[in-house]
Swiss-Prot record:
Chain spans, region G4: 124-127
Family statement: Belongs to the TRAFAC class TrmE-Era-EngA-EngB-Septin-like GTPase superfamily. Era GTPase family.
Listed CDD domains: Era, KH-II_Era
Record region (G5): 152-154
Residues in KH type-2 domain copies: 204-281
Source domain of life: Bacteria
Record-given protein name: GTPase Era
Known function: An essential GTPase that binds both GDP and GTP, with rapid nucleotide exchange. Plays a role in 16S rRNA processing and 30S ribosomal subunit biogenesis and possibly also in cell cycle regulation and energy metabolism.
GO MF terms, alphabetically ordered: GTP binding; GTPase activity; ribosomal small subunit binding; small ribosomal subunit rRNA binding
Coiled-coil features, chain-numbered ranges: none
Assembly description: Monomer.
Subcellular location: Cytoplasm; Cell inner membrane
Region (G2): 41-45
Gene that produces this protein: era
Length: 295
């Protein structure tokens, strides 16, 4: 019996916050793995997505958005994004086609050039008519002639098949790093924490979602095939805790119910979710939390 030839290719997806990196990863692997919200800087760490197509395994790295960081957490997120480039065969810079170029995007291009990296450009959100699209195409084509350019819609899936054909064409003969049906290498505890953090982003106003983190402290598989999960939402101030709890605990109950539903859908089993809020001043300066967040 002839042994199957295996190929692998790794792809790093970088770009500004809210340019569509997480939506693209989810679209390609066919699962909602990376959390998505309308707020910027939702992704804090590298999210690895895996899809195996015939003889080729594609490993995708969704990264935190690149911007001008100020605080300790923001700086760690941007460092995390840049660190992912060195482990990838392809670097894809995703650009929001609904916005003009700005200094941050130019700085990203300059840094890629200084690193001798020739990125693939992905002009995203073409499902919406944009007055900037043609100018973006012209600028990139003229100033970066060695780079390929794909207009895509991560949301609708337009041109994603073409993009995948290109990605798989760059695969090299090498043993797969993961099982054929794996979609990520992230621990289930981490994924569960990300699901709850997504609901905190969606259900809390203003800056509060940026001032917290979530840790899964307990994951217990029960005899009836359900899972008991205890999570701690860590905040820096007592006033933040009050907001998250809500009147008579109404807000945290709402967040818990929505998180549990998302977990049951992702993990395909009944979930018993228990949320707790703890105040830890200056948690953003504690390396322990960064290790848990993988940044």
């Amino acid at each position: 019996m002839t042994k199957q030839i295996q190929k692998t290719v790794s792809v790093c997806i970088i770009g500004r916050p809210n340019s569509g990196k997480s939506t693209l990863l989810n679209r390609i692997i066919g699962e909602k793995l990376s959390i998505v919200t309308p707020k910027v800087q939702t992704t804090r760490s590298i999210i690895t997505g895996i899809i195996t197509l015939k003889d080729t395994q594609v490993i995708l790295y969704d990264t935190p958005g690149i911007f001008e960081p100020k605080g300790t957490l923001e700086k760690a997120m941007v460092r995390c994004a840049w660190s992912s480039l060195h482990s990838a065969d392809l670097v894809m810079l995703i650009i929001d086609s609904l916005k003009p170029f700005d200094d941050v995007t130019h700085n990203i291009l300059d840094k890629l050039c200084s690193l001798n990296i020739v990125p693939v450009f992905l002009l995203n959100k073409i499902e919406i008519e944009s007055k900037y699209l043609n100018n973006l195409k012209a600028f990139l084509t003229e100033n970066h002639p060695d780079s390929l350019l794909f207009p895509i819609s991560a949301l609708s899936g337009k041109n994603i098949d073409r993009l995948l054909e290109y990605i798989t064409s760059k695969a090299k003969i090498a043993p797969w790093l993961y099982a054929e049906d794996d979609i990520t290498d992230l621990p289930m505890r981490f994924i569960a924490a990300e699901i709850t953090r997504e609901q905190l982003f969606l259900n809390l106003q203003q800056e509060l979602p940026y001032k917290l983190t979530v840790q899964t402290e307990k994951w217990e598989e029960l005899k009836d095939k359900s899972v008991k999960i205890n999570q701690v939402i860590v905040v820096a101030r007592e006033s933040y805790k009050t907001i998250i709890l809500g009147k008579n605990g109404s807000k945290i109950k709402e967040i818990g119910a929505k998180s549990r539903m998302q977990m049951e859908q992702f993990f395909s089993c009944p979930i018993h979710l228990f949320l707790f809020v703890k105040v830890r001043e200056l948690w953003e300066n504690n390396q322990e939390f960064y290790q848990y967040m993988k940044i």
